[in-house]
Amino acid sequence: MIFAKGHGTENDFVVLPDLDAALSLTPSAVAALCDRRRGLGADGVLRVTRAGAARAAGVFDRLPDGVSAGDWYMDYRNADGSIAQMCGNGVRVFAHYLRASGLESADEFVVGSLAGPRPVVLHGFDPARATTAEVTVEMGKANQFGAGSAVVGGRSFDGLAVDVGNPHLACVGITADDLAALDVAAPVSFDPALFPDGVNVEVLTASVDGAVSMRVHERGVGETRSCGTGTVAATVAALAHDGADTGTLRVRIPGGEVTVTVTESTSYLRGPSVLVARGELDPHWWHAVAG
């Protein structure tokens, strides 16, 4: 049972090539795999398969809107084993893995997800330097759906609710010094009526010279070094804070920097991907943790 390990701005993933979608990704198996002491350690798991194979295996009952049976499909699981609709950093790593492993020969193709199709572009990919890549993902339209508040690190923040294929509350206005000192790892509280399935919470500075700084508490994970969909939500909120609906911002997260462009009809996330390891999981260990 082979695997790869990669990260997008230090949001790290275990990649499991499983073209027939035959693996039993139980919550207990995913949680063990992502545990940094008893497994490989990661913020999530990316199963590499085709959408048609995932449907046939019962991963979902019907193809997500806009996704074809022949499309690559990113079956993404959070570190606690729960299923997530979308992960922007994960799509970059997923696309990079496909190209670096030879499963995909084109530099532009579509990655399917529960949130729908995500077109990707690998910029100047060099097979001789396949461990690194620069990838743009078309993330779709980011939709605002209200205002809310959250308590993070003992402080209350007002924010903008944004749907990027998954729910976010992006809270603009903290100073850079206060952001650095904020305890984002602690559990957060939020309005369950607005976010019945939980929410990813971003706390960020207002934009200065075309850039913001952000930290994120991801549902099912806790604080991560980066969150791709979160950077899109943060950009939408920062632009709205400045009275704009569209624009481009650089978003600085603890794991690095990405560039997000928001248009009237869609959004784009561009950033790095790094593949750091390949290996083989012990089948006896896997069967033991899969339950």
Swiss-Prot record:
Enzyme class at the top of the EC tree: isomerase
Would you tell me the protein name for this molecule?
A: Diaminopimelate epimerase
What highest taxon heads this organism's lineage? Bacteria
Name the Enzyme Commission number(s) assigned to this protein: 5.1.1.7
* Sequence similarity: Belongs to the diaminopimelate epimerase family.
* PROSITE patterns linked: DAP_EPIMERASE (PS01326)
Upper classification of the source organism reads:
Bacteria, Bacillati, Actinomycetota, Actinomycetes, Mycobacteriales
Q: Which Pfam families match?
A: DAP_epimerase
Give an example GO cellular component term for this record.
cytosol
Q: Which gene is transcribed and translated to give this protein?
A: dapF
InterPro entries, per the entry: DAP_epimerase_AS, DAP_epimerase_DapF
Q: What does the function comment of this entry state?
A: Catalyzes the stereoinversion of LL-2,6-diaminopimelate (L,L-DAP) to meso-diaminopimelate (meso-DAP), a precursor of L-lysine and an essential component of the bacterial peptidoglycan.
Q: Which HAMAP family match?
A: DAP_epimerase
| GO process terms (BP) | lysine biosynthetic process via diaminopimelate
**Residues where substrate binds:** N11, N78, G88, N89, N166, N200, E218, R219, G228, T229
Pathway listed: Amino-acid biosynthesis; L-lysine biosynthesis via DAP pathway; DL-2,6-diaminopimelate from LL-2,6-diaminopimelate: step 1/1
Q: How does it assemble?
A: Homodimer.
Say yes or no: keyword Cytoplasm present.
yes
According to its UniProt record, where is this protein located?
A: Cytoplasm
What's the chief localization of this chain?
cytoplasm
Q: Where is the active site?
A: C87 (proton donor), C227 (proton acceptor)
Q: Which GO terms describe its molecular function?
A: diaminopimelate epimerase activity
Query: Reaction(s) catalyzed by this protein?
Result: (2S,6S)-2,6-diaminopimelate = meso-2,6-diaminopimelate
Site feature (Could be important to modulate the pK values of the two catalytic cysteine residues) residues: H168, E218
